[in-house]
Amino acid sequence: PARLPDGRVLHLPIRPLAGTGNAIASLILNQASFAVEAALADALAERLAPFRPDIVAGLPTLGLPLARAVAERLGHARYAPFGTSRKFWYDEGLSVPLSSITSPDATKRLYLDPRLLPLVEGARVALVDDVISSGTSISAGLGLLARIGVTPVAVGCAMLQTERWRPRLAEAFAGPPEAVVGAFRSPLLARDGEGWREA
């Protein structure tokens, strides 16, 4: 189970990692109930509010509904969604390669629509994804923001999954470690008899 800041508990499925004896808790946000999605957005917005972002930027795919909901809770009129589908008016200069723990061999690119550039240039940006696990997806988002001279004031997600992301974000994110926040954390798990314990 994963405990939210307000004390409520989420029961998440455990996914064994092949050949390791370890496992991770799994969160697939678009398969969660609306109540769970709302609770995670509430918790993340509360964690991001002290950083006073002007705009929330969201990473595709599952980070987009969370970013939108967080932006609404922060009182913003809109958010800045990044995308992986290239429209004909996009600028390749506003893109970076993208892979993730769930699609490591993908050759996608992460794009910012040039029309959204005025929203993020010079702004206090909070960059949001659903889960930060290996740190590859969020690092791509940080790289894209760096191309336009923006260092986010905070990085947020619903679930900080294990600690594997820390080294990659230490390289990619110029902000302080405490500016990386999640609605909850989920440790790496190790087999313990018939169940699992924190590794």
Q: What are these model-predicted stretches?
A:
Residues 60-66, 134:
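Gly/Ser/Thr-rich loops at beta-strand to alpha-helix junctions
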Residues 1-52:
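Active-site-facing substrate-recognition patch
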Residues 139-199:
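PRPP-dependent phosphoribosyltransferase catalytic core
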